[in-house]
Amino acid sequence: MKVNTKSKKVNKAWLNSHVNDPYVKAAQKDGYRARAAYKLKEIDEQLKLIRPGATVVDLGSTPGAWSQYVRRCLSPEGAAVGALNGRIISLDLLPMEPIEGVQFILGDFREEPVLAQLQEALGGGKADVVVSDMAPNLSGNGTTDAARIALLVELAVDFSIHHMKPEGALVVKLFHGGAYDDLVALFRQTFKVVKPIKPKSSRDKSSETFLVGMGLK
């Protein structure tokens, strides 16, 4: 049997990089489920989006690192458990291990039964902040992947228009490439203030970036 030594070397290099990543180590130390928590943390510390008493909706929440960060923001003690000053509703197509104080809804938020659960969780109100770390399964085809990424961002924007307060904020993940300029234009059409941010915790070689839209037009 022929062994692909190049592939094995690449996998080993990635594993070494992952194990030695300071954000991976920090996540383990701080009790976060993924290093992604620090991306939202950087964005939030820069823009002060998540405040005590806020209602936050986390789209594409699994495994839950962003919800964990939000939970700590809304805790009077900054704790992972205990009292909570605010509301967190997380949605994903995949199951998520429970987080104390976080209401999780399993399903596609485009479907009526799931939307009904969300509206019930919101108690007739709207979100102060919507965060979306949604990402598609990538095919390797640039055109196809750009379209999939664009669709998820567009869905998050549409969700915010209908379920977020006028003065609220939306954070989405996207990637530089095919549809990037069009998505920035969509944000500028939708929000009063638009800020592209590349957190330090995003990997250097990644084309990943984040867009923040504040205040619906």
Swiss-Prot record:
Q: Which InterPro entries match?
A: RNA_methyltr_RlmE, RNA_MeTrfase_FtsJ_dom, rRNA-MeTfrase_E, SAM-dependent_MTases_sf
Where do the annotations place S-adenosyl-L-methionine binding?
G64, W66, D92, D108, D133
Q: Which UniProt keywords apply?
A: Cytoplasm, Methyltransferase, rRNA processing, S-adenosyl-L-methionine, Transferase
EC no. given is 2.1.1.166
Catalysed reactions, semicolon-separated:
uridine(2552) in 23S rRNA + S-adenosyl-L-methionine = 2'-O-methyluridine(2552) in 23S rRNA + S-adenosyl-L-homocysteine + H(+)
Q: Cellular component terms, GO, for this chain's entry? A: cytoplasm
Entry superkingdom: Bacteria
Q: Does the keyword Cytoplasm apply?
A: yes
Q: What does this protein do?
A: Specifically methylates the uridine in position 2552 of 23S rRNA at the 2'-O position of the ribose in the fully assembled 50S ribosomal subunit.
Query: What is the similarity comment for this entry?
Result: Belongs to the class I-like SAM-binding methyltransferase superfamily. RNA methyltransferase RlmE family.
Q: This chain belongs to which protein, by name?
A: Ribosomal RNA large subunit methyltransferase E
Query: What is the native source organism of this protein?
Result: Delftia acidovorans (strain DSM 14801 / SPH-1)
